[in-house]
Amino acid sequence: MGYAYRIDDQHGVYFVTFTVHQWVDIFTRKIYSDILLENLRYCQQHKGLKIYAWVIMSNHCHLILSTESFKLSDVIRDFKKYTAKKIYQAIENNESESRKQWLLWLLKKEDHIWFWEEGYHGEEIRTKEFFDTKVDYIHYNPVRAGIVEKEEEYLLSSCGDFYGVRKGLLEIEPF
């Protein structure tokens, strides 16, 4: 594992990116993004995960997070492993998935499910200025992708919480 992927301070605040293998557009289907959200909630409730900002795009997600009681690298490892398995199973069981055979072929190598790209590009956040830069980057992602005109319009994001537009889909923490 390279230096860019290391978590030096297991209880520090980090900006991370999880990318779907081969940048496959999987989270265009609500069933799969819901699995991601459910597992993030589980980690918040049972593993002490704190989420400060987040966005789920079609083929990746960005989060700013930390943890209190568990090692952050362990929580990330378990999260990626569990969501990979659950999303792969959801694809297998989804009769209406038009890309089913192709996705199953692409996301499995030998006997191993390969849903996520390796690593998570963790960057430790130590200052409010760097935090604000990363929050802006996260929330503007759907605008850059041409999905929405204003970042607060995108539902799979913490932006609504930040602007006070709506309660988001995940609990977020103040920095």
What are these regions (language model features)?
Residues M1-F175:
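Short catalytic/metal-binding and nucleic-acid-binding patches
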